[in-house]
């Protein structure tokens, strides 16, 4: 496995792979890897080569968010990548990604102002800008992203289509702890009491899925049922609960096919997200 920190060197390695007609699967991460990331790596191994990038992107954090305290353990991350058959770990620093006088950004005017985008101003501009750069540097064939960041997946798919990137975005299922909590690097922030309270988030998701399976169509009733579960936990503050069209992120009144049910909530000071997809509904 190669551990690369230079943009120039990464581009040269990719150029060599491509000259031998090797396909590239790419997993973008901010590090502090967990089983959710490793499931993306496993999916990426269907390609000839697998690249994992580790970059805590300052551009996608707001002024009062957790950039400085975001969990980092590079040595552990590199070992996990090596143990799971990754071919290249790309770890650039911010000075390489954002040169002096950097002034070019990728912005979007529609789906980024909903859900997390409405709460985290500038977040998706940072995500799209850094991923556009990574796509240009690493020239992947397929990019593997987790459904837990569902809105991000949709936003990046739109960017790929709009800017004619020659790659495919593959969305992979949410990986959960044994008790149901969605795997997240931020789970490490939770105290023991907060960790117990956080289960209300996944429980609200599972209840909503059950209601849909039982035939409930009224989204206001589903949202209220989810809200009732979350409000029982005094350590939880709801950020949003929404049911939206998965492609447009527009709110809907009645359940149909291709609907995203999404929750964001603060457990203590930690913001967690979770979701479910309604697909194949007849």
Curated annotation (Swiss-Prot):
The reaction proceeds by a bi uni uni bi ping pong mechanism. It catalyses: (R)-pantoate + beta-alanine + ATP = (R)-pantothenate + AMP + diphosphate + H(+). The keyword Cytoplasm applies. Catalyzes the condensation of pantoate with beta-alanine in an ATP-dependent reaction via a pantoyl-adenylate intermediate. HAMAP family: PanC (MF_00158). ATP binds at residues 30-37, 146-149, 175, 183-186. PANTHER family: CYTIDYLATE KINASE/PANTOATE-BETA-ALANINE LIGASE, PANTOATE--BETA-ALANINE LIGASE. Pathway: Cofactor biosynthesis; (R)-pantothenate biosynthesis; (R)-pantothenate from (R)-pantoate and beta-alanine: step 1/1. One of its GO terms (molecular function) is ATP binding. It comes from Campylobacter jejuni subsp. jejuni serotype O:23/36 (strain 81-176). Beta-alanine binds at residue 60. The keyword DNA repair does not apply. Disulfide bonds: none annotated. (R)-pantoate binds at residues 60, 152. Homodimer. InterPro entries: Cyt_trans-like, Pantoate_ligase, Pantoate_ligase_C, Rossmann-like_a/b/a_fold. Keywords: ATP-binding, Cytoplasm, Ligase, Nucleotide-binding, Pantothenate biosynthesis. It is found in: Cytoplasm. The active site is at 37 (proton donor). GO terms for cellular component: cytosol. This is Pantothenate synthetase. Belongs to the pantothenate synthetase family.
């Amino acid at each position: 496995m190669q551990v690369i920190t230079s943009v120039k060197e990464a581009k040269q390695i990719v150029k060599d792979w491509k000259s031998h007609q090797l396909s590239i699967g790419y997993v973008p991460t901010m590090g502090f890897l967990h089983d959710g990331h490793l499931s993306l790596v496993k999916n990426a191994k269907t390609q000839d080569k697998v690249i994992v990038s580790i970059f805590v992107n300052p551009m996608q954090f707001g002024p009062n968010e957790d950039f400085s305290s975001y969990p980092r353990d590079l040595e552990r991350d590199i070992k996990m990548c090596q143990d799971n058959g990754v071919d290249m770990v790309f770890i650039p620093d911010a000075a390489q990604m954002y040169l002096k006088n950097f002034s070019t950004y990728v912005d979007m005017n529609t789906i980024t102002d909903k859900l997390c985008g409405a709460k985290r101003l500038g977040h998706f501009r940072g995500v799209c800008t850094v991923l556009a750069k990574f796509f240009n540097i690493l020239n992947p064939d397929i990019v593997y992203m987790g459904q837990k960041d569902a809105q991000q997946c949709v936003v990046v798919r739109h960017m790929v289509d709009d800017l004619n990137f020659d790659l495919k975005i593959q969305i992979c299922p949410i990986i959960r702890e044994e008790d149901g909590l969605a795997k997240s690097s931020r789970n490490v922030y939770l105290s023991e009491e907060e960790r117990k309270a956080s289960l209300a988030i996944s429980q609200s998701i599972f209840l909503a899925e059950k209601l849909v399976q039982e035939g409930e169509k009224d989204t206001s009733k589903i949202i209220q049922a989810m809200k009732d579960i979350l409000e029982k936990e005094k350590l939880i503050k709801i950020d949003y609960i929404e049911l939206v069209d998965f492609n447009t992120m527009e709110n809907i009144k009645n359940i149909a096919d291709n609907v995203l049910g999404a929750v964001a909530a603060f457990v203590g000071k930690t913001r967690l997200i979770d979701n479910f997809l309604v697909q194949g509904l007849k």
